[in-house]
Amino acid sequence: MQRVSRLKRELQLLNKEPPPGVICWQNESNMDDLRAQIIGGSGSPYEGGIFNLEIIVPERYPFEPPKIRFLTPIYHPNIDSAGRICLDILKLPPKGAWRPALNISTVLTSIQLLMSEPNPDDPLMADISSEFKYNRAVFFSNAKKWTEKHALPAPQGSDKESQEKSGSSEGTSHKRKSAEIAEESKKPCREP
């Protein structure tokens, strides 16, 4: 019961006072299944992109963190090809920093900040992390191309293309260029 009333309050607050560049809503009639959109921050390679996220609220929320993943493909050292996010507040202690006092709005704001300021020292995508650390211009260019391809709104009149770019189409692939990103470069998020 505490979970349901808290979720209702959080959704009302997110609806009434959303963080800048963040939208969150209930998917269908299931309160445990939320969707969110984060607008890429200005000055970042994700600028102007609309990134869709899936939020699954666990039965033990707020004592367990929500499960969040990107539905829109994104070129980022802390987000893998399945959309999983390496962020300490998405994990329970001792490996993570989730606390019941945190809420979905705080988590979405933290993800938005992670998009602007990647953490190359705790990557999910080692090759992208190396690129970010040692060749920032190439990283920026690649991330910008991914944003243009997958996250920018399509020109008016192209509904199918718009769905594909936003990641909302059921058939959209969340796989990266597998030839360029070798399987061995994908490793689990390092423990702090």
Curated annotation (Swiss-Prot):
One of its GO terms (molecular function) is chromatin binding. It is an enzyme of class 2 (transferase). Pathway: Protein modification; protein ubiquitination. Residues 150-192 are annotated as: Disordered. Residues 2-152 form the UBC core domain. It catalyses: S-ubiquitinyl-[E1 ubiquitin-activating enzyme]-L-cysteine + [E2 ubiquitin-conjugating enzyme]-L-cysteine = [E1 ubiquitin-activating enzyme]-L-cysteine + S-ubiquitinyl-[E2 ubiquitin-conjugating enzyme]-L-cysteine. Its EC number is 2.3.2.23. Residues 178-192 have a biased composition (Basic and acidic residues). The active site is at residue 86. Its main location: nucleus. Keywords: ATP-binding, DNA damage, DNA repair, Nucleotide-binding, Nucleus, Transferase, Ubl conjugation pathway. InterPro entries: Ub_conjugating_enzyme, UBQ-conjugat_E2_core, UBQ-conjugating_AS, UBQ-conjugating_enzyme/RWD. It is found in: Nucleus. GO terms for biological process: DNA damage response; DNA repair; protein autoubiquitination; protein monoubiquitination. Belongs to the ubiquitin-conjugating enzyme family. Accepts ubiquitin from the E1 complex and catalyzes its covalent attachment to other proteins. Catalyzes monoubiquitination. Involved in DNA repair. This is Ubiquitin-conjugating enzyme E2 T. It comes from Xenopus laevis (African clawed frog).
